[in-house]
């Protein structure tokens, strides 16, 4: 975070939550996550990895590097290589750490007196009588009530060993984290195994495995604590109950501590993840290398949530005790599985002759992704309270007459052919080009399943020219530029081939009149649907000064997303469908300066980077169309403005 120009990393503070990473802005309304490539396997998250098992991480931003990833490369690529054994004796490494975290910069809120004054001013402006705050004597900072100081610990052990022909790595880790909100806790156990064996001098095989068991945190929202009136006391000691909120709020929200405390530990969730690959690599005819790799990733997530009966103190009702909700216990249960299977076949040619150097790669890859989810919910039967016991939190114990269910499933496949060439002349003039052709089942019914992606790039190492040799303080100067096209098929829903008929309404027809069921299409099919395309280019320079101690890099970039996937407004009583109806532009400047030096046996470094990102929606569906998000409709996306800009009154 903060070390690489053009990369934004946002941590929510929730225990175990994945950081939000954006590379050079937001390219689409349908997802911003970069592609992770872990030891060759494509992935959309890396929560199964132990940070201690990561050997290196590289972030690709420029078009010439991303185009080779085709339909998956539009949002940037993060390449992660996990640790492997290095030749030498067997080594055992054990490390552990612990720490604490807390919210140090809370949002400033008015106290009870200030709230009463502002709320009554609002009522007067609306022509309404003032609210009687007489029974509301509290002065509560709800943020203080819900926040805690969280404890964090990470513990790892690894064993490595290698010989001239064989190497292995075994790593295991345990992480535990408490969240910023009371009762939040998260734990993860990880396992990493790799084994490589050199069968002959020119043929080797190996495998990689990563596994994880995660107990995710039952996270609660901070929003209620920011909206709850400070005039309400937290707790009524006489009744031993949390208090309700004033009448103007209690219909919309509960006392924040009801969710944080009384609903704590009411969810039992377990996530399992297994990811790995096997490969074979053959070097032949001096300059050729052929590599085959088969990879698989499987995730299984299950959860059970219990709904307890909750009573709160309310002085405005007879008896002063109110039961929230329907007064019934309930259980919700779900199971989700996702499988990813990938195969890669790569042929590489490398040669150097005279002043020329060439590396060429050709390949064929396949990728398959399938997700299935099934969930259900039941409440208690008459007089049959579901016990507050995790062993009983299964929907089979509830009343079948109250059962509801949900499901989600989809599968997609991608087939790709690719090629890339890297060439340099005299180590001064650098050229590269790539081509990738992707075919996706997501668009197979439209006839637009195939898409080509290209890139070209060039660099000039000016410092290697004769006319630069006399500049002693300049060690390296390089000018560079690239252009490429990228793709994006990401959408938070499947691409169904045929719409279903749903029995949504009834109609009266005939004489004598009779009621007949009415049907409508579940969505508007679009036979011309195609995936989003991103055209990007950049130009910049790199330089090293003062015996390579000072490094500078500056880049200007521009990316334009076309054929943006968006929902088409419903017409003639139909549900909205999906269409290519928008475009987005991102452009900006990246500057980075780093200084590295040594003083005796001590090394030190200092760095600074600056990134500007200007995001703008160029067009979206039709004039005046907007996408509204947020519980108070405070986030808008519409043409002429950035994605998700804040919408509201301007005040001084």
What are these regions (language model features)?
Residues 3, 39-67:
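Short acidic/polar hinge/loop motifs at secondary-structure boundaries
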Residues 3-6, 14-20, 28-30, 34, ...:
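Residues embedded in well-ordered regular secondary structure
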Residues 6-8, 28-30, 43-45, 63-68, ...:
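Short beta-strands and strand-coil junctions in structured, solvent-facing domains, enriched
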Residues 8, 20-24, 34-39, 56-60, ...:
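Soluble periplasmic/extracytoplasmic beta-strand elements of cell-envelope proteins
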Residues 10-17, 49-52, 69-74, 184-187, ...:
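Short, glycine-/polar-rich solvent-exposed loops and beta-turns at beta-strand/coil boundaries
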Residues 11, 23-27, 38-39, 61, ...:
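Flexible glycine-/small-residue-rich
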Residues 33, 123, 150-153, 188, ...:
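Extracellular/periplasmic, surface-exposed regions of secreted and cell-surface proteins
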